[in-house]
Amino acid sequence: MEIKKPALAGTLESSDCIVSVEPSRDNTIEINLTSTVKKQFGNEIIRVAKEALKNLGVNSVVMEINDKGALNCVIEARIEAAICRASEINEFDWGNYKCQD
């Protein structure tokens, strides 16, 4: 999926996160994480984010994740929503989506 415009999804409530995405100027994936549980789960959050981007076919994005203790499924859902909004797609092909392990 091509990121066409900045977009975000989520809240700053406990057990949630805000994910913001925007097009990358140098065609790379950049993930910046701010989290209340970064020391314990930072590597796992980054892994979930990279896997979600791979499953969505995103090869170029700048992503900011502001996490307040969200579960992996919440993080993935917020990433999916932000990417879909940024890609300006109105319908998602769930039949071809690869679920995370």
Curated annotation (Swiss-Prot):
Please name the InterPro entries in this protein's record: CitD, Mal_deCO2ase/Cit_lyase_ACP
The entry's cellular-component GO terms read: cytoplasm
Which parts of the sequence carry O-(phosphoribosyl dephospho-coenzyme A)serine? 14
Keywords assigned: Cytoplasm, Phosphoprotein
Where is this protein localized, as stated in its record? Cytoplasm
According to the UniProt entry, the coiled-coil residues are none
Assembly description: Oligomer with a subunit composition of (alpha,beta,gamma)6.
Q: What job does the chain carry out?
A: Covalent carrier of the coenzyme of citrate lyase.
As for family, the record states:
Belongs to the CitD family.
Name the UniProt record assigns to this protein: Citrate lyase acyl carrier protein
Organism for this UniProt entry: Clostridium perfringens (strain SM101 / Type A)
